[in-house]
């Protein structure tokens, strides 16, 4: 018997509840950790020894995964406007990514090290007004992409959360101009009703 939309939505919510429980059980700070795990395993994103930058890191789920994958070999630098409790193996900077002084501090922490992977799960403060939220969300993604054009190593990768809507097509084209390959990912832990989707840029162009 074909599932109805309602039953599919229920199943998705049930799975999401599972990830919430699993995160608490396994010590991850957010269910978002499982989104990164799924994508990282599928696309082989992490290798020990690499330099990783996590933008919009708080509360730290993605940074936890990055630190585990690096296994003490490499560097992980995380940034967020909100406070984040320390994570072993991760350097944290608190500040607004949109401010030049904060971006300069991030670059100083990297000390000219080539960045191999940028992961970005940033979201704007939600107003509930779709047009405003979409515009702000795309702006954050654009800033992260701009950071990649300046700091990401040739051949490096970029994973970013975006929301489908106004500005998405233009941003996708900008990603394709920056990377050899761009794919979309919707991990199981992502809420089914959400318009969020992850874009993965593979192999930054010279």
From Swiss-Prot:
Reactions that this protein is recorded to catalyse: uridine(2552) in 23S rRNA + S-adenosyl-L-methionine = 2'-O-methyluridine(2552) in 23S rRNA + S-adenosyl-L-homocysteine + H(+)
InterPro entries linked: RNA_methyltr_RlmE, RNA_MeTrfase_FtsJ_dom, rRNA-MeTfrase_E, SAM-dependent_MTases_sf
UniProt-annotated catalytic positions: 161 (proton acceptor)
Organism encoding this protein: Nitrosospira multiformis (strain ATCC 25196 / NCIMB 11849 / C 71)
Gene Ontology molecular function terms on file: rRNA (uridine-2'-O-)-methyltransferase activity
PANTHER family the record matches: RIBOSOMAL RNA METHYLTRANSFERASE, RRNA METHYLTRANSFERASE 2, MITOCHONDRIAL
Coiled-coil segments: none
GO cellular-component term (any): cytoplasm
The protein's enzyme class: transferase
Residue numbers binding S-adenosyl-L-methionine: 60, 62, 80, 96, 121
EC number from the UniProt entry: 2.1.1.166
Domain of life: Bacteria
Family affiliation: Belongs to the class I-like SAM-binding methyltransferase superfamily. RNA methyltransferase RlmE family.
Location in or out of the cell: Cytoplasm
Function of the molecule: Specifically methylates the uridine in position 2552 of 23S rRNA at the 2'-O position of the ribose in the fully assembled 50S ribosomal subunit.
Name listed for the protein in its UniProt record: Ribosomal RNA large subunit methyltransferase E
Keyword Methyltransferase tagged: yes
Matches recorded under HAMAP family: RNA_methyltr_E (MF_01547)
Keywords: Cytoplasm, Methyltransferase, rRNA processing, S-adenosyl-L-methionine, Transferase
Pfam family, one: FtsJ
């Amino acid at each position: 018997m074909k599932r109805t939309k309602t039953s599919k939505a229920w199943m998705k919510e049930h799975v999401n509840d599972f990830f919430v429980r699993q995160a608490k059980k396994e010590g991850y700070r957010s269910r978002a950790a499982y989104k990164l795990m799924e994508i990282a395993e599928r696309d082989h994103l992490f290798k020990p020894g690499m330099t990783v930058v996590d933008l919009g890191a708080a509360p730290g789920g993605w940074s936890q995964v990055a630190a585990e994958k690096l296994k003490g070999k490499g560097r992980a630098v995380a940034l967020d406007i909100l406070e984040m409790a320390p994570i072993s193996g991760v350097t944290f900077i608190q500040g607004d990514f949109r401010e030049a002084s904060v971006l300069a501090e991030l670059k100083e922490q990297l000390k000219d090290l080539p960045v191999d992977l940028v992961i970005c799960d940033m979201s704007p403060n939600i107003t509930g007004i779709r047009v405003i939220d979409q515009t702000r969300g795309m702006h954050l993604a654009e800033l992260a992409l701009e950071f990649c054009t300046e700091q990401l190593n040739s051949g490096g990768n970029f994973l970013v959360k975006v929301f489908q809507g106004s500005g998405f097509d233009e941003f996708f084209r900008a990603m394709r101009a920056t990377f050899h390959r761009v794919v979309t990912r919707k991990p199981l832990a992502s809420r089914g009703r959400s318009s969020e989707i992850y874009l993965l840029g593979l192999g930054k162009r010279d």
